[in-house]
Amino acid sequence: LERYIPRARHVEIQVFGFGDGRAIHLHERDCSIQRRFQKVIEESPAPGLPDDVRRRMADAAVALARQQQYAGAGTVEFIVDARSFEFFFIEMNTRIQVEHPVTEMITGIDLVALQLRLAG
């Protein structure tokens, strides 16, 4: 049974895992503004997201990457109820996404270079 969330937001947490159980998050991107199921605008930090929700989402994303001993850049995606701020896991994209420059701009971290260093 699936839950219907009438005012849903699509929020992603950028993670980077080192392959040995260590992982970090590089903040979130709100990609709720979409047209024909394609992202139009990515915003970071996600506007109006309470700090405690932001922290719990980041903790959940990092825990997933750590538990899997994930190596490299990945994006953990969530649906967030805009009224209650309850969030639900959608999927993890195990690659660098086209939106990675948004994260690079706010963190100053070159994700492609970091991936290459991990691989080398």
Language-model regions, residue ranges each:
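ATP-dependent carboxylate activation and anion-phosphoryl transfer catalytic cores
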Residues: 2-120
